Regions:
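Alpha-helical transmembrane-bundle signature of multi-pass membrane transport and export proteins
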Residues: 1-440
Length: 440
């Protein structure tokens, strides 16, 4: 295997101008949100001197992102996605501008902060879902895993570097300039997205399920139930979101089990991202996998074993290694989940299906924190990790046995003619696979 084959495939960025624009917009969105989150937490705590006040802001953001994702998915299947993306990004820029104006006031208002946070959460949820739904129409079908790897890599890098940059800017100038910087960069990317071509939902001409074009969320649910591959991916994704890496256990384990302090805690929080970035940066082998369904299930099983290993670790070094393995396995899963869901979902339903995947991550994180905290109270932090890891590993095995269609799932591998126009630069969207061929 050549070293070049292991590196991340940037083909989608080379061949599709529209995907490049979407990609840049998503990167700026993630970095802006990460930077603003740090400034927001610092400002709210400085005003209230209360962790509860910070938690309220975080909860408002989580809930509104969830609502925005679901509503954005519904709208993405009913209207031109270019228009939806532009309105969402412009709204996010206004929310950041509102936070900046409020921060520069002699006495900032807490209610204004919460209002802007809610507005930005809704806009971000709509934007992320619409961007994810439209991306597959801008690249060739065989480039879906590569597009997923690029999206995953930027998400992981953003989760590590954006708070760091935000913290540096916050320490140097306060929250106002952080919010202002985020507002300006978000506004600039909105202007760049004006170059996108119209992106209406695509409908297969031979589709006989006309009632599914009403835009109803029930239609997406019916499709997921009927399509064994997509349905199994959504079910397994929900379990992984709920029972995956238990980050809320980190403080108690570090302070009581490992005998460490704040520095060790901070290092432990970076472990999953380190594993994820390493895999994303060397994801060429993933995008060329001959049996992506089997590899996805293996990654899900490995992630469960990593959580079990974390629970049994007994030391910070072993715990870090297990978390890095878990982060790496989770990224392999996410890349292939993205490609398989997008490939097996018709474009007219893609917004609603993607919104479910996005909502799973948000809602699963919130509910998962509560679940693992309760289990840790009944048993111990290590016991809670063992329970969660076992559930994830067993779920992967059950799905592998019960849904052979997912285990045998494949992705397009054909190489297009070099003289063909680049994906996403023409006027015709790339159609999704016929759903009747994916229900086995």
């Amino acid at each position: 295997v050549r070293a070049a084959d292991l590196l991340i495939d940037i083909g989608p960025l080379r061949t599709s101008r529209d995907f490049r624009a979407i990609f840049i917009a998503r990167v700026v969105s993630l970095f802006g949100l990460g930077m603003a989150t740090v400034a927001l937490a610092a400002q709210v705590f400085g005003m209230t001197r209360s962790t509860f006040g910070v938690a309220v802001a975080s909860m408002i953001m989580s809930v509104t992102v969830l609502v925005g994702s679901l509503w954005g998915g519904w709208m993405a299947d009913r209207t031109d996605r270019r228009t939806l993306i532009l309105w969402a990004r412009a709204s996010a820029a206004l929310a950041f501008a509102g936070l900046a104006v409020n921060a520069f006031l002699p006495e900032p208002h807490l209610w204004a902060i919460y209002l802007c946070v809610a507005w930005d959460g809704l806009a971000t949820g709509v934007s992320v879902t619409a961007l994810m739904a439209v991306a597959p129409t801008l690249v060739r079908p065989d480039q879906l895993p590569a597009a997923g790897a690029l999206i995953s890599l930027t998400g992981e890098i953003g989760s590590v570097t954006a708070p760091l940059i935000g913290g540096i800017l916050l320490a140097a100038s306060g929250p106002g300039p952080v919010f202002a910087f985020t507002a300006v960069t978000t506004g600039i990317t909105t202007l760049l997205l004006l170059r996108l071509r119209p992106l209406p939902p695509f409908k297969d001409e031979d589709d006989e399920e006309g009632h599914e074009d009403s835009g109803s969320p029930v239609a997406a649910f019916r499709f997921a139930v009927r399509n064994r591959v997509v349905g199994a991916l959504l079910a397994l994704g929900g379990i992984n979101a709920l029972f995956s890496l238990p980050v809320v256990l980190f403080p108690e384990l570090v302070y009581t089990e490992f005998g460490g302090g704040d520095f060790m805690l901070g290092v432990l929080y970076t472990a999953p991202a380190v594993g994820a970035i390493a895999v994303s940066a060397t994801s060429g082998w993933i995008t060329r996998a001959g049996r992506p369904g089997r590899l996805l299930l293996t990654a899900a099983f490995t992630g469960g074993l990593a959580v079990i290993g974390f629970g049994l670790s007994g030391s910070a070094v072993v715990a870090y290694a297990m978390l890095a393995v878990g982060g790496a396995a989770g990224t392999v899963y996410e890349i292939l989940e993205y490609a398989l869901v997008q490939h097996n979902t018709p474009d007219r339903l893609r917004g609603r299906i993607v919104s479910v995947v996005t909502a799973q991550g948000t809602a699963g994180g919130i509910a998962g924190d509560v679940e693992v905290a309760l289990v840790a109270r009944w048993f111990s932090p290590a016991g809670a990790a063992l329970v969660n890891g076992a559930i994830c590993a067993v779920a992967a095995v059950v799905v592998a046995v019960a849904v052979p269609g997912l285990r045998k799932a494949t992705l397009p591998r054909e190489e297009p003619d070099d003289d063909a126009p680049p994906a996403g630069d023409g006027g015709t969207p790339v159609p999704a696979v016929d759903i009747r061929s994916a229900t086995a």
